[in-house]
Amino acid sequence: SSDTIMCKGKTGAKILQKCWPFKSKYEREYLDTTDNLVRGMFKGLGIRNTYATLSAFYQKGKFRFFETGFRLSGEMSYNYYEHLTGINYMDSMIRYAMGDPDAADYKEKESATSVSMVLNFFLTDGVIGRIKGIDELSFYKAVCKINTYIKEGDTVKNATNVFKKGLMVTLIANSQDDLYKTVAFVNTHLDIEDTAGNS
């Protein structure tokens, strides 16, 4: 489970999901009040061995779902899920698709000892001049994965209500304090500049 932290903006501003911290601060309440209903829904649909996401607003003690997805998700959760739980659901689904009836190796994992966060870095219009800090981040212990969606020389033109994503950095740490320090390190060392030198 995760929460979504949005960048601050006025009503009608472009949508920027800055990060997804794991696990959600509402996880215990979700497990106690709602999880059995969601599981019952999927079982009732006859769905087996799949990956699904549900997005919800938490309002006045209730989870109000507004989206369900069956793709592998934009945050690429397979990059951190195995580190956190020991479960590689990609391997399980591949084995199941190839006919292995015993491929469902999922276990109940209500909590993990590590903490995780996915940081998104969005781009404004312009031409990418330089991407700084990738090497420094790649050697930092708590940086699990760096997904790069642009390269120097690319032209960025935001034509929708969502800015183009330039980078996504997945972090896994042993404690909240280590996670906060890693976020600070990433924000200090990582930068994307346009050809005019603007950050």
Regions found by a protein language model. Name each.
Residues S1-I47, Y51, Y58, G69-A97, ...:
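ATP-dependent carboxylate/phosphate-activation module, predominantly the ATP-grasp catalytic core
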Residues R48-K60, D105, S199:
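A short glycine-rich, hydrophobically flanked beta-strand micro-motif that places a catalytic Asp/Glu
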Residues I94-S199:
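Peripheral (often C-terminal) accessory segments that flank ATP-dependent C-N-forming ligase machineries
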Residues S55, Q59, T85, E110-S111, ...:
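Flexible domain-boundary/linker segments
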Residues R64-E67:
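Protein kinase-like catalytic core scaffold
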